[in-house]
From Swiss-Prot:
Top-level taxon of the source organism: Viruses
Native species: Human adenovirus C serotype 2
InterPro entries (alphabetical): Adeno_V
The encoding gene: L2
Modified residues (Phosphothreonine): T85
Taxonomic lineage: Viruses, Varidnaviria, Bamfordvirae, Preplasmiviricota, Tectiliviricetes
Compositional bias ranges of the Basic and acidic residues kind: 22-31
Cellular component GO terms held in the UniProt record: host cell nucleolus; host cell nucleus; virion component
GO biological process: viral release from host cell
Protein name: Core-capsid bridging protein
Main location: virion
Compartments where located: Virion; Host nucleus, Host nucleolus
Length: 369
């Protein structure tokens, strides 16, 4: 043990290193007391001057954004007489009664050009719409109308000024009719049956610009033309079989006997026969649905194939590699033993429609009940 350690132990017994709280030093100076200065009362003359003029802000508060109001062009209201009379104030502008406004012959032209009574209020924005795609994916049809923009916002949302994502883009609708039919026959003689549902076909997206595409949706509305009705009625009138003629003669005799007993009436309107359009027989499919067919696939060698299903076990082909010949001249072929696959128990499950499925029996872990 060194002498330094012995001295430290002796000092620890005599004067242990335990320190008490520090002593506060006595303040030799007295704290300074602050005196509040009383404001002198202003004279009465100064109060009178202050009451007359009071400047709250020397300069107007500046806005963060330099904003300017819209420039308004003064438009003289129609019907106002411009007369200058010295010493008299100009009267309030006169506005016509709307009964008089509605009587104008060029009312629509005034509203379109924003003239007269239509020259006030918010200026409407001229909407300029450009079609992104004018191609026709159905060559057998011809367009009748232009591409009209469909409103995507409700009227209440437009008034509130709501904006949605991609608000600059809007869908369009266009009416198309068959090329081989005349336009008058299609628009005038065709009737739409409300009970039939239209056939909808969604076409793939066509790219018109980088990052921008157009998707066409074909809605085929089933219609019944009056030409089919006319041909059907003509066919009924020109039937000349002997059975029909005998029935017609009997009907004529019965009508003549009834006419002799009752008053004779003349029919001026032609008879209307409601004949349904002939339905085309639905083509029978030669093949089953594509979802019911399983593709040909290869299984991993570790997977045992299930009987009743397609698929085969993948066997990698041996690559043609050059081997060194042994000096003895004898070759040994190394055959890879194929793993012995255990047979799989299979169960057949009957489904609706007389279909049977071959499913493998599942094997559970011993811990699963």
């Amino acid at each position: 043990m060194s002498k330094r350690k012995i001295k430290e132990e002796m000092l620890q017994v005599i004067a242990p290193e335990i320190y008490g709280p520090p002593k506060k030093e006595e303040q030799d100076y007295k704290p300074r007391k602050l005196k509040r200065v009383k404001k002198k009362k202003k004279d009465d003359d100064d109060d009178e001057l202050d009451d007359e003029v009071e400047l709250l802000h020397a300069t107007a508060p500046r806005r963060r954004v330099q904003w300017k109001g819209r420039r308004v062009r003064r438009v003289l209201r129609p019907g106002t007489t411009v007369v200058f009379t010295p010493g008299e104030r100009s009267t309030r502008t006169y506005k016509r009664v709307y009964d008089e406004v509605y009587g104008d012959e060029d009312l629509l032209e005034q509203a379109n050009e924003r003239l007269g009574e239509f020259a006030y209020g918010k200026r409407h924005k001229d909407m300029l719409a450009l079609p992104l795609d004018e191609g026709n994916p159905t060559p057998s049809l011809k367009p009748v109308t232009l591409q009209q923009v469909l409103p995507t916002l409700a009227p209440s949302e437009e008034k509130r000024g709501l904006k949605r994502e991609s608000g600059d883009l809007a869908p369009t609708v266009q009416l198309m009719v068959p090329k081989r039919q005349r336009l008058e026959d299609v628009l005038e003689k065709m009737t739409v049956e409300p009970g039939l549902e239209p056939e909808v076909r969604v076409r793939p997206i066509k790219q018109v610009a980088p990052g921008l595409g157009v998707q066409t949706v074909d809605v085929q509305i089933p219609t019944t033309s009056s030409t089919s009705i006319a041909t059907a009625t003509e066919g009924m009138e020109t039937q000349t079989s002997p059975v029909a003629s005998a029935v017609a003669d009997a009907a004529v005799q019965a009508a003549a006997a009834a006419a002799s007993k009752t008053s004779t009436e003349v029919q001026t309107d032609p008879w209307m026969f409601r004949v349904s359009a002939p339905r085309r027989p639905r083509r029978s499919r030669k093949y089953g649905t594509a979802s019911a067919l399983l593709p040909e696939y290869a299984l991993h060698p570790s997977i045992a194939p299930t009987p009743g299903y397609r698929g085969y076990t993948y066997r990698p082909r041996r690559r043609a590699t050059t081997r060194r010949r042994t000096t003895t001249g004898t070759r040994r072929r190394r055959r890879r033993r194929q793993p012995v696959l255990a047979p799989i128990s299979v169960r057949r499950v009957a489904r609706e429609g007389g279909r049977t499925l071959v499913l493998p029996t599942a094997r559970y872990h011993p811990s699963i009940v």
